[in-house]
Amino acid sequence: FHQLISSQLDVDRMDYLNRDSFFTGVREGFIGADRILKMLDVVDNELVVEQKGIYSIENFLTARRLMYWQVYLHKTCICAETMLIQIIRRAKELIKSGEEVFVTPAFGIFLKESISLYDFKSNPKYIEAFTQMDDTDVWGCIKVWATHPDKLLSNISQMLLNRKLFK
């Protein structure tokens, strides 16, 4: 059953493909997740696909490939992600230098502390904070940072909010 939540064919991947397909309007990403799940079985503690489900699995793999090319690796998406990384880095720098920067509690842990992958995996505090975080934490902070006195932080935040992306 571990393979249902952590594999190349896990329910999270099926969910985000359908969700991302819906919200971006890219129909090629839509998959029949219900049908795929009905076609799965467990044999000798391994997840297997019934013969009649092979076509649905092929569609899933094709949909993932198409979504990568049309959405995830699209120049606009990559640019917005780069800007988001710069915003977070700048906020982290300001916090580290003692500057007052608004941040939600869950997001703040990751901006105020230097956390290695080992720390993240071994300390339940970080996993708990991560699971408490969602898009609202990030976007809420960016909206507040858009009026921050630091021009770099505020300008890039405003640009991302207004979808004026780097060229």
Where do the language-model regions lie?
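Histidine-centered, transition-metal-coordinating active-site segments
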Residues: 1-167
